[in-house]
């Protein structure tokens, strides 16, 4: 029975490794702050973004991720600030944290080059008791790991009116140590993540715009992964799109610009190699520019 318990716990820990890595959102291209801190202030007006994602519905302990963020450009200055609260839970692991963002933008001819950094703190909690093992009295399965850990990231974003190119590493720290019962143990840390992003906007006519985008992701010890996306906007109000993530998933996206200030989006994701592993994602954004007398680009495609 003990071997069965250990097998179950080991399997769940292996699955929970997904939470140790940077969360991947299907709608990342509409708020790249999670991927690139240089994106702070890119929209020129103050804006708040809310995002929640649920995976593998119906499975106890399935991944759940969410965040709320705010960023804005400082008036008459070339720098921007922002902040974010987030959580990322899966099986026995719980992560939550706070982040601050700072970016500096250098105007160029017909484009802008922005450099940004993020900094914050993350609470990591792994409760092995959540596994509900058959042999509940096993001390090895009653351990709780809890620690507060520093986070930092860096990014660059070069953008024009209809295009952007970005390079970033939202997590510069790789692994951590923690004290449990007076003993130093290795905690499951986050491997270094490196992103290259890019996109372009094609105006088909006055009512239709196409926006292809690409994201390359490199993680230490894992194959290079790319995310290819195509979105179409109709009348600056309705956006429909689809994404393909190599060897991982396909994503369908629907966006609605209710007015110049408020946008809502939904993404449905289906894993390619695993059945019954769908994910649902909801995004909402509100921009304060209209209230402050500033012009809002409706819609802003990135």
Task: Give names to the regions the model predicted.
Residues 1-2, 19:
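Initiator methionine at the very start of the polypeptide chain
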Residues 2-8:
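Sec-dependent signal peptide recognition
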Residues 14-16:
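N-terminal signal peptide c-region/cleavage motif recognized by signal peptidases
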Residues 20-302:
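Subset of outer-membrane beta-barrel
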